[in-house]
Amino acid sequence: MADPQAGSAAGDWEIDVESLELEEDVCGAPRSTPPGPSPPPADGDCEDDEDDDGVDEDAEEEGDGEEAGASPGMPGQPEQRGGPQPRPPLAPQASPAGTGPRERCTPAGGGAEPRKLSRTPKCARCRNHGVVSCLKGHKRFCRWRDCQCANCLLVVERQRVMAAQVALRRQQATEDKKGLSGKQNNFERKAVYQRQVRAPSLLAKSILEGYRPIPAETYVGGTFPLPPPVSDRMRKRRAFADKELENIMLEREYKEREMLETSQAAALFLPNRMVPGPDYNSYKSAYSPSPVEPPSKDFCNFLPTCLDLTMQYSGSGNMELISSNVSVATTYRQYPLSSRFLVWPKCGPISDTLLYQQCLLNATTSVQALKPGASWDLKGARVQDGLSAEQDMMPSKLEGSLVLPHTPEIQTTRSDLQGHQAVPERSAFSPPRRNFSPIVDTDSLAAQGHVLTKISKENTRHPLPLRHNPFHSLFQQTLTDKSGPELKTPFVKEAFEETPKKHRECLVKDNQKYTFTIDRCAKDLFVAKQVGTKLSVNEPLSFSVESILKRPSSAITRVSQ
């Protein structure tokens, strides 16, 4: 019975649709479709009706009885071709079918009745599943009321959005009538409604694309905990949704703050201001605007944070320059120097040069401010053979006591230190075995001696300003130290001993100028230091800044006096 009815229904509806098209002038064709897979009806009219239905549910429920009697045709049973009147045997089924779970609005034989039924809203959930159901009185009995398919979820989100918009328009209309529409209240309420509308739209988009929304990631990948922004401008910028712009602004903000910290921290090189090398590399790669090339292999695992804060703004050349030149002046074991320390800053910003000079001055004065009697800090760091020769050189303040072997205990006199030079055991300050190819071709000893003599004469005749004077004296010493490990002749000892003697007078003059800085550095560097620790025979010297700065030497005392 169902098949012939379906076939006759299809033909019957075609005839009704054509006749109704002639009758309607503007409204359009009736939207009643067969119960099979149906094309989606016009959403414009239905959406408005659905909105009114979503807001006014009373109007939706008020006509349950009307629908059963209003439609002469039976819902759920299409009429046959010949008879405009419904079949008498099936007439008693009209009232229960009107309240059943499945309702189908079909045009009746009359001209006005089908037009009225075609304009009634249809259930969007039923339409998603190929069924056309009149929405009036259908909400409670919809078969797909709790369906969780993608189409039905999209319908729910659309209904929420439309309901929020309708509520906003109604509230604005009532406020305009009462004359209470203040701008502040409007903005607050509008923000609330927009916030309600925005989240469902994201959910609807995710439903359309076939996936659920992912929880929002933490800032910068979630792997890097960052301090909050430091300015009101950045806090306001965080309100925008542009993540790339936020990253750029945050990077600029952190650079400005780090430059301020650098200018404050560069006053003293404290031993505890150290950062592990891997942390520095990851930090630099995370915040640098351009891809950063990894540091050269002659850099060790530790870098002072005072230098790190500026290395990320300059190129690799400036980074090597600042680190190597400061290490020449202060003998930081963390900077194995390459032969490129003669290079001066490239065409970078002026802040690099100023920072370098300030770091050089402060680091040099901090080494000169060492008190007698301070102890070596022992650590289990091993001496690496691959370090370059300049790393193992001490500045001219040590007065030639550059070769320090492992003995049962450290002797504080200069003669004892020089007497143990013949011990074959290697120490932290002994020349390393050069098992790597030199970066730059080594010059002859005569050429280097000539350069040393020339620099020493210029340094004696024309005393440089306060910033440049320490570097030139140490620059001179380092050139002599370069030739020592390579030649390995008795002349090495003579070169080490002669150079400090030549520049002792210059250093004494410098120390008189640095008196005010020495007092300040001495207070900060030796607050919690102990005295009297001795070295064991088998424990190597540490390559940390603490061990260098806590060096007890009568030579340093003699020079500083």
From Swiss-Prot:
Residues 68-84 have a biased composition (Low complexity). One of its GO terms (cellular component) is chromatin. One of its GO terms (biological process) is myotome development. Residues 1-119, 414-435 are annotated as: Disordered. One of its GO terms (molecular function) is DNA-binding transcription activator activity, RNA polymerase II-specific. Residues 123-170 bind DNA. Residues 13-26, 44-67 have a biased composition (Acidic residues). Residues 32-42 have a biased composition (Pro residues). Belongs to the DMRT family. Transcriptional activator that directly regulates early activation of the myogenic determination gene MYF5 by binding in a sequence-specific manner to the early epaxial enhancer element of it. Involved in somitogenesis during embryogenesis and somite development and differentiation into sclerotome and dermomyotome. Required for the initiation and/or maintenance of proper organization of the sclerotome, dermomyotome and myotome. Homodimer. This is Doublesex- and mab-3-related transcription factor 2.
